[in-house]
Amino acid sequence: LRDMGVTTLYLCPIFESASNHRYNTADYTKIDPMLGTEEDFRTLCAQAETRGMRVVLDGVFNHTGSQSLYFNDDGFYPTLGAAQSQDSPYYDWFSFHPWPREYDAWWGIRTLPAVREDCPSYVDYIIENENSIIRRWLRAGASGWRLDVADELPDWFIEKIRAVVE
């Protein structure tokens, strides 16, 4: 790839998901086992760097999957998701009308519950916390992020991500 002039490897979503396209993230902290392990990712990033290449991840941050750790509509995960309990640590990430069956979904697609980007605990989890998703994967070797449907994210949210990446 380097000999062909490639300088950046852009990876479509790599995180655990219930689908093969992985735009319905189930867990931002785990790489889909179909793609490899976190160690494989670290190795890829290190090898890319030795060849003068960068690895860019695809961040899907305006919705998750309904079958996710965070929403957990099907009860797959052992922790309480927002669809299971109003006591879930993720409940405030989503807008229900009323809880639990009616909620905002990306473009009305019920398997893609929309996230409230203005929720402080969500911003902390994705961006601001020292162990946030953005920081975690940068430390693992990613060089940057491509933001899925960035036009639908608030400008301030994108600016916060940019500040962390820079």
Which residues fall in each region the model found?
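Residue-level recognition of beta-strand->loop/alpha-helix junctions
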Residues: 10-13, 148
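Substrate-binding/active-site clefts of carbohydrate-active enzymes
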Residues: 3-7, 14-136, 140, 161, ...
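Short catalytic-loop micro-motif centered on adjacent basic/acidic residues
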Residues: 56, 144-150
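Acidic-and-aromatic substrate-binding clefts and catalytic sites of carbohydrate-active enzymes
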Residues: 33-35, 150-156
